[in-house]
A protein has these predicted regions:
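Conserved beta-strand/loop subsegment of P-loop NTPase cores
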Residues: 30-37, 54-96
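Switch II (G3) loop of P-loop NTPases
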Residues: 1-19, 27, 38-39
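Residues immediately C-terminal
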Residues: 10, 42, 68
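Conserved ATPase-coupling elements of RecA-like P-loop NTPase cores
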Residues: 12-19, 45-48, 71-74
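Short, solvent-exposed amphipathic alpha-helical segments in soluble enzyme
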Residues: 20-22, 50-54, 76-81, 104-105
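C-terminal structured domains
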Residues: 18, 24-31, 39-58
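NTP-binding/hydrolysis catalytic cores, primarily Walker-type P-loop NTPases
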Residues: 79-127
Length: 127
């Protein structure tokens, strides 16, 4: 079971650690924070968000707005810079209909064939 909470701006009240403490969520074992980034951000913007979002619970990156990007090199760059795995890929106007697990196959097809997960039938299959 998962609950998604869209948090306030990363600069709100001292960053994610302060926000989590304020809402009584700090120190919870099963809490995971995921940084949502767009490949349309510049490298400087993505690195800025990563610096602001760093907290004990930061577990992965979710790439969003993939359908709006003209290239996907930032996915590789941020994976290296952050040391975080990619957990999900989102594209299109719907959250649930346009979200796929970030499997190896989905990432390879996106990077090398420029295919979004919704453009082939076995997008969620691990490979």
């Amino acid at each position: 079971e998962a609950v998604f909470i869209d948090t306030p701006s990363l600069t709100y009240g001292g960053g994610p650690q302060s926000w989590l403490a304020q809402w009584g969520l700090a120190g919870r074992d099963q809490l995971a924070a995921h940084l949502v980034l767009s490949p349309t951000y510049s490298s400087a913007q993505s690195e800025h968000y990563l610096r602001l979002a760093r907290c004990e619970q930061l577990a992965s990156i979710i790439w969003t707005k993939l359908d709006e990007a003209c290239n996907y090199g930032s996915l590789v760059n941020m994976a290296h810079a952050s040391g975080l795995p990619v957990s999900a890929l989102t594209y299109g106007p719907e959250l649930t209909g346009g979200m796929a697990a970030a499997s190896g196959k989905a990432l390879w097809k996106l990077l090398f064939k420029r295919q979004l997960p919704g453009q082939y039938p076995d997008a969620d299959a691990a490979a």
